[in-house]
Amino acid sequence: MNQKENNYQLVYNHIKQKVGNFSPQICLILGSGLGVFASEINKHFIFDTNDLKGYPKSTVSGHKGNIIFGEINEKKILAFQGRIHYYEGYSLNEVVFPIILAKMFNISTLITTNVSGGINPSYKPGDIVFLDNHINLTFKNPISVIPKSLRIKRKYKLCEYEPKIL
């Protein structure tokens, strides 16, 4: 196991020891504008990422850096209150950390949020926009750094969006 995989395992073990048998079904990664959504979660466990050795810290204003285990409408949730960005200087191994933790908790449904209002001037703050594709201007594939044992097997490799959720 290399150092990156060791960091994933250390953080997972620390969290798992605290949450025990709590088994989230859905992972939410809350970006700018929806961090406040965390107030809607009936929280069972909250982890400050500043206290998790090996976990990258978000530097974006408004990203609290909490990992929350809780419930919304009787659905068990793992929520990341703040995202980690490649443009912050983090490696792809660090950017995918929340995805890897979600997979380690056997979560198969992932919902990420972001600010995308700039793509259409008719969008207003708070509008919900479902994306079914994206343009990767970094020319880096974050999936390539996820250990093969933790990758979700997909029928279609080019697009990781799930039509039934959209």
Predicted region positions:
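Long, non-catalytic terminal segments
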Residues: M1-I26, L30-F37
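Glycine-rich phosphate- or other oxyanion-binding loops that anchor nucleotides, phosphorylated ligands
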Residues: N2-N13, N50-L166
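N-terminal low-complexity or amphipathic/hydrophobic leaders
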Residues: F22-K53, S61-G62
